[in-house]
Amino acid sequence: MRISINYVVMSVLIIIFTAKYTENMNAIYIWQQTDWPNFTWDDAKLSYKLGKVRGLQGKLVGKMSALGFDLKNSAILDTLTADITKSSEIEGEILNSDQVRSSVARHLGIETEGLPEADRYVDGVVQLMMDATQNYMKPLTDERLFNWHAALFPTGRSGMYKITVADWRQGVEPMQVISGAMGKEKVHYQAPDSDNIPFQMKLFLDWVNDDQKIDPVLKAAIAHLWFVTIHPFDDGNGRIARTIMDLFL
């Protein structure tokens, strides 16, 4: 059920990006367009997909309401465990699913007998998701995002490399998405410069916390695209973008 809803969200992302990007072909990147970040979309194309989401949500609510307390907790535990492990897999990182399940169960107050104790990193990743899904009514602030980022990188490093943790990325080196061998690199995307991030994130957070009359699925899709476009952190942007999406869903 969750996979189907996320598939629809990604379809919405494609529709929004296509509509936005084709408005001004003179801009190299989406954030350089003159009307950034005023997103537009095609209601006719989205209405069917959003209707499918509501149908799936209705079925899910119906099934959950028919479950007893223990089965409902078990279903929530299974869903969160899968969501957390799959999000990390997207980044090429394989988490120990038993440790993830153990940490999620502990945060939910569910018996963890027979499960291994989660290590510091796994517990940090779980804390990130639990804060988003359990405290979804709280405002999203720069401090909250910094806490999420710190939970992802408790050692202050990404692999072997020291990174800026719990703060926006810094330095003059551009944040680029590149492919190709050394000397034949192709730049596919370049994010806003680091000195532009505080301004860009203020725009983003003001919009996120504004009580707009907008479908939560659509808001989740826009927020995901907007956040990864800014790419405000040295690392972990994809995982935090998906966590923001979960916050709205």
Question: Language-model segments: what does each one mean?
Answer:
Residues M1-L249:
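FIC/Doc superfamily catalytic core
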